[in-house]
């Protein structure tokens, strides 16, 4: 099931229209109205093959932790705007959002649960595969 979360009714309408135009049956889609920070916590662990995060950048750290929980092993996390107008790669850029995204990218590179790749397309896509991590003692 293709699940979309958005707080804006216009975005929800546009999503439904795009799904219909793509020929995706409505019973294969779910549009959830609400704040992603609250909705994500109610979704099922390990039930998703792909999670795309394209939301308020301040919320990215929370959304990413929830997304990792939602992904099955082998699932893919995609984050939009990870180059943030080419400022993330510029050490002289130190505004709050740039620093947040730079730190998040570094944290994801160091996260043993993920195999990340930053693609320099558009405003930067970070694509990360969730890998199997044995629990301690295994």
Ranges and model annotations:
Residues 1-138:
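S-adenosylmethionine/decaboxylated-SAM
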